[in-house]
Amino acid sequence: MKFTNGFWQTRAGFTPLFAQEAYDIRTDGTSLEVIAPTRVIQGRGDVLNRPALTVTVSSPAEGVARVRIEHWRGTASRPGFELAEGDVGAAEVTESGGVLRTGDLEVRIRQGAPWSLEFWDTSTGTRLTGSGHKAQGYLTGPDGAAYLHEQLDLGVGELVYGLGERFGPFVKNGQTVDVWNADGGTSSEQAYKNVPFYLSSRGYGVLVNDPGLVSFEIGSEAVERVQFSVGGEALEYLVIQGPTKKDVLRRYTGLAGRPSVVPAWSYGLWLTTSFTTSYDEETVNSFIDGFAERELPLSAFHFDCFWMREFQWTDLEWDPRTFPDPEGILARLHERGLHTCVWINPYIAQASPLFAEGREKGYLLRTASGDVWQWDMWVAGMALIDFTNPEATSWFQEKLRVLVRQGVDSFKTDFGERIPSEGVVWADGTDPEAMHNWYTQLYNRAVHEVLEQELGEGRAVLFARSATVGGQSLPVHWGGDNTSSYVSMAETLRGGLSLALGGFGFWAHDIGGFEGTPDPGVFKRWLAFGLLSSHSRLHGSSSVRVPWAFDEEAVEVTRLFTRLKLSLMPYLFAAGAEAASTGVPIMRPMALEFEDDRSAAHLDTQYLLGHDLLVAPVFTEDGTVEFYLPRGTWTSWWTGERTVSTGEWRREVHGFDSLPLYVREG
């Protein structure tokens, strides 16, 4: 959100006040509390009739500093994310100011004017970032609404990454990003998985601890700063020291949660019914028979929306017209060595039998007038399960347990983004704006808990679309609704790499694209990319993604890359275990793995799969691909040719049966 009109002026209707000095600094030995008036105090009269900000600095974990800025403490503030809590800082106040030390991170607040709050890495003697003149602000808008913002310095050449799954440029400098979950597809500025956490090329990260709307201006309003703002009377953020990006991810996921281990079978190929196609048990069997006849390895089969009766989503009951024997079909799929997944969402259609039950028991979200909140987008008259009500959560979970006991192994937890933020009342009184992004965490956690309780630890896996901070602990997530084109394939990868820098260790996407029907070339190129992702799923909207629907070569490509992925299983499972223990993702942006290589900083069309496999998907019809081979010794997976690179760009042409795939020595 922009508040200024150039450096000197403010946008019409906004009144800004900034922290001008650290007037009074106090400590209890573990934290600092600062009174930061919005004018320089030169006489006793200056302390009157003017707002002052209260700034508290503490440390919840080693190497992490928490800064809380408050105007009026008496105003109810939104709760933050569920973060690990501690109090490990060592603070002192001297004549020159206040200092808080936590591990190798040091926070320095200068006494007096001008306002200066700095973050230093003492292991390297490097100033990471800081807040200075006109940086820490309290503003009122034209409608009287209050906002708080902070601006942290950007150094020369400093790059910013992350902020969740974003499909635009991988490097976020110059962008405006509103952290607000939305069902916008992969070709817009909106995102399904918004995470108010960014990672800097200078070896630190910043988390804004607010589940509501957080607006970022990354060198886009004040070009030498990252600005983040929230509505209300309080703003809290955490600065996380590295010194490497991987160290930052370890510390961040130590606070916000690390991915759980997913079952080995989930790394294999998933096939689905697709969305609006017509299917029944005979159709499902024909697909699976087709894979078996062609010797195509398959790990899981997914039933999309129409396993339930139309107009009744979500009733969690099999449609007896198409699946009269659900226990039987699930058992028969298991006998064939397949695991099973079904589609769900947290919306209850008016025609669903669950609607009347949920309304009667108070399990559905209410409006301020006490009515059940409803609308007609998606399914007619749909309501929303209120997961802030523990009884509603248990009610929903019991319905899911029935399905797991029938033989369902996984759930595709679709949607979770279209959550109203005005005119509704949650059972626990949570601010509706805060619940908009946070809802997905409650939804996915409720489902994940059922799978873990019923199947055992390490055997739960979701296929989730929406997320926020903490969502990384409930894998797997997929990239949402893309289209069947090379351009969409590339934007899908950008979203996945961006998400990876928020500690999301596992990720998938719809091979061939969701909307439309890919031409055979796009499908075959996407197969190679999809089967060299952590998780792999064949899924579409109005057309199926069985490879023989395209051409015989697609069958060969499916066989080749599925077998390749299966051969990598020990390697992938080890990378998954690393993600679960450290927060370092399986699919790694080049900037994460090659920090000192400036040529790697912007790369978003290639990645490392685990620590040692470089993958460069092909995004062209003729098979031409340009990619960067970092310094080191690399061996071509296909030819065994060994290359000693000094850091070089390569141009290759690949058929559908290959792509640049290089193994790092060691």
Kindly give the residue locations of the regions a language model identified:
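Generic recognition of flexible, low-complexity loop/linker segments
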Residues: G43-R44, T54-V55, D183-T186, K193-V195, ...
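Active-site-proximal structural scaffolding
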Residues: R50, Q190-A191, L199, F228-V230, ...
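Carbohydrate-binding surfaces of carbohydrate-active enzymes
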Residues: V34-A36, Q42-A52, T56-S59, E295, ...
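Beta-sheet entry/capping signal
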Residues: V64-R66, V99, E106, S116, ...
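Short, glycine-/Ser/Thr-/acidic-enriched flexible segments
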Residues: W72, P114, R202-Y204, P211-L213, ...
